[in-house]
Amino acid sequence: MEDSGRPGPGGGQGRDRRAQITMTPEEREAFLTANRKVQVATVGPDGAPHLSTLFYALVGGRLAFWTYAASQKAVNLRRDPRVTCLVEDGEDYGELRGLMIRGTAETTDDPEEVRRVGTAVTAAMTGTAEEDLEAAGARGEIERAGRKRVAVFIREERTASWDHAKL
């Protein structure tokens, strides 16, 4: 994020305030693990942003989600893999936390990868351990749902984070 150099709220410099609220790598990982919805911005065919909200999971340490292969976001990502993702939470100013990830989407229709991401996302959505999903017989349902989907992994190139509870 660019720093304007102008004093921020409370009279401090923007750079100092930004450093104060930036999450550490450990805080970022904990934040991503604790949340489950991400806003995904792709580049539409006319160059305008296309936004959608999806459930996600961390798979191999990377933000990942699955989506219908024919969805606008999947079509956009095949044409132009640039993506910005936003995970945020909090209601009041002092509670606001967020992580913006700008990067490249790596999309695959490999059935095993789609199943792996689908299982992780389903576990995150339901609050159920992946092993328990498998034991409950969810694998077949996830594989059926995955036939029309692709898995998307986000390769981070730039991030910005904030945690107003640090103020």
What are these model-predicted stretches?
Residues 38, 63, 83, 105-106, ...:
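Short beta-strand segments in beta-sandwich/barrel cores
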Residues 14-42:
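Short, conserved active-site entrance elements at the starts or edges of catalytic domains
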